[in-house]
Regions:
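Glycine-rich phosphate-binding active-site loops on the catalytic face of alpha/beta enzymes
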Residues: 15-32
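Catalytic-loop motifs flanking and including active-site residues across diverse enzymes
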Residues: 8, 32-38, 125, 129
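Active-site beta-loop-alpha junctions enriched in small/polar residues
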Residues: 1-5, 24-25
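Secondary-structure transition/capping motifs at alpha-helix termini
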Residues: 13-20, 46-50
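Conserved, mostly hydrophobic/aromatic
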Residues: 16, 39, 133
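A mid-to-C-terminal "edge-of-domain" accessory segment
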Residues: 51-183
Length: 183
């Protein structure tokens, strides 16, 4: 109940306990339920990945809860939240482009079938936009590409008129099409 629902059973494992009680997404009749998905990842961190475990099922379970039964998962919830592995800072996006291991807690693509994501804001800069394009279009464009800079100018213009929210993916797709698919 005091944010110890993962560290307590993990510590118990280290001292010889063979199991812990847990529930999917930590959902239960009270607060402080241990999320099963967290313990699966903790076990992998402690003992190494088990080839018999389907780790991407964690993402599939979250998608089922979100889309199948309409359960609202907090966007920043570890492992399953929509934005748990999303950066908004251009310097981090640039770091991800150079060496993802430094800026990501683990290989989220390998473990959860979820790539590290970038949300575009006034802090993203050309590096954040480049990473977004790489993820969404598989196009390796340089940060000084005129088309990319045209998108950055549109992002900057949004925040110059006091925008406070991230640029949405539909907006980015539209701006990408305008900049990259011009005839």
């Amino acid at each position: 109940d005091f944010y110890k629902s993962v560290v307590n059973p993990e510590t118990a494992w280290l001292y010889g306990c063979g199991a812990c009680n847990a529930s999917l997404l930590g959902i239960g009749e009270r607060t402080g339920n241990t999320p099963l998905e967290a313990m699966v990842v903790q076990a992998a961190q402690l003992c190494g990945m088990d080839p018999k475990v389907n780790y991407p099922a964690i993402t599939e379970i979250a998608e089922y809860f979100r889309n199948g039964i309409g359960h609202d998962i907090t966007s920043n919830m570890p492992l399953v939240g929509r934005d748990f592995n999303t950066t908004r800072a251009g310097i981090h996006a640039d770091g991800l482009l150079k060496c993802e291991e430094i800026y990501s807690c683990f290989d989220t693509q390998k473990l959860l079938d979820r790539p590290v994501a970038v949300a575009i804001t006034d802090k993203s800069g050309a590096a954040g936009i480049k990473h977004w394009i790489d993820i969404n279009y598989g196009e390796n464009v340089p940060k000084d590409d005129a088309r990319l800079l045209a998108i950055r100018d549109k992002v900057d213009a949004e925040y110059e008129v006091d925008r406070t929210t991230a640029i949405s993916d539909p907006e980015m797709h539209k701006w990408y099409a305008e900049a990259f698919e011009q005839k």
